[in-house]
């Protein structure tokens, strides 16, 4: 994976959040090779900088425009945030027929990545955004443990990539539709 600028550089535990933020804003992709938990902290630190930047930008434009304009600007800011954070990537590799994340203190990703991506081919590797990997790991926990849906009175076990009913008002709304006679 390369960024729009075509550059990918290695980042590790010595990479500061300010340095990472500057590189990411220039379009560079950062291949994380440090400690797993430090990588998560780096993502949060870069996200805080993006939030501050959006707040400063938003304050200038806050009064200008309609509610629709504000909504569109918020969507643009979120898309930009996702695009920038998505350029912090990690390499997954196949080992013994399972996915492996070879970072210090990394969780076992074999089950989660196998569930989301399928079993790897021999020698296969995959470069994925760190944030996407976090989503895969979280979704796998939802799949294993289930998500309580009060409107149903039971748990559902969503797969990765499937809408998870974590916002009960959506399920309640669908449940209320059964009361309407069309």
Task: Enumerate the predicted regions with their spans.
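Non-catalytic protein-protein interaction scaffold segments in large eukaryotic complex-forming proteins
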Residues: 1-20, 24, 29
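N-terminal auxiliary segments of SAM/dcSAM-dependent transferases
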Residues: 9, 28-147
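Short amphipathic alpha-helical segments, especially helix-boundary/capping motifs
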Residues: 2-4, 16-19, 59-63, 148-153
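Class I SAM-dependent transferase core
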Residues: 131-178
